[in-house]
Amino acid sequence: MVKQSRSTRGRLGGLPDPERWAYAQGGHELRCFRWAHPGKPAFLLVHGIGMGHLTFNRFIEAMLPHAEIIAVDLPGFGDSPEPEAALSIADTAELVAAAMRAATTERGIGPLIAVGHSMGAQVVSELAAAHPGMVDRAVLFAPSVNAAERTLKQQAKRMVQDLFKGKPLIAIVVGVYEYLRTGPRWFLKKLGPTLEHRIEDTLPKVQQPALVLVGSRDRVTPPEWCYEVALELPHGELTVLGGPGHEAMIAEGEAAAERVLHWLEG
């Protein structure tokens, strides 16, 4: 079910107001945000755990002259209401697919270049594998979960290390704001399915061209792990962005956009 949402200004700083709508299915609702640019490639942005589409702010700003952007807030994150139970990663991908099918019918949105950050990369991998007609290319930014550290204790340790490893102020401010909106209860509910999902089992099924991006100081999904991710992709490439950690999408959105655009042209 699709519900139109009233446009408001202010959340995304200097960005123009997007078209907004909600999509609900089976007690789970996600919010969609679209910056239309007819004739340009359509990008779908899927955020990580504890976050919302605001984490892509700088990436969106850099991409707007070159692309149409559709960003989502997954159930319980950003502007989307919290459901009673957390979906698996695969079921989350199916919810996103249903929302995009509806958007294709109602708004004429074509094949997508799907971009996922952290947990969002897990969702994008499932989406690309299950719906090759919908996803033309995939970008996996800091894809979780590192197979060598798939426990709550290890992930918590790495998140703390990453937080205090020279993270830029903008990444801290946006990250704290989004985590506070999510709240610890829902974060932990969604963390279970995130840790259970094995992205390495899905990667060989992704037949589209795929780009893996990671910050050189990422402690949560380090470059060594992302190299393994790229190797598992039939048509994968890896780029390491100098400097930033796990929230490089926030701190280095412009650099990420530049690399993605260069990849599309190659």
What are these regions (language model features)?
Residues Q122-A130, M134-G166:
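Flexible "cap/lid" loop of the alpha/beta hydrolase fold
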Residues R31-D79:
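Conserved HGGG/HGGXW glycine-rich cap/lid loop of the alpha/beta-hydrolase fold
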Residues V173-D201:
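Hydrophobic, aromatic-rich cap/lid helix
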Residues V206, V212-V214, D218:
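Short beta-strand/loop motif that positions the catalytic acidic residue
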Residues P244-G253:
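Catalytic histidine-centered segment of alpha/beta-hydrolase-like enzymes
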Residues Q208, P222-A230:
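Short alpha-helix in the alpha/beta-hydrolase fold that links the catalytic acid
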Residues M1-F43, L64-A67, L261-G266:
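Alpha/beta-hydrolase fold catalytic core
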Residues Y23-H28, F33, A71-I113, E258:
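Active-site loop/oxyanion-hole signature of alpha/beta-hydrolase fold enzymes
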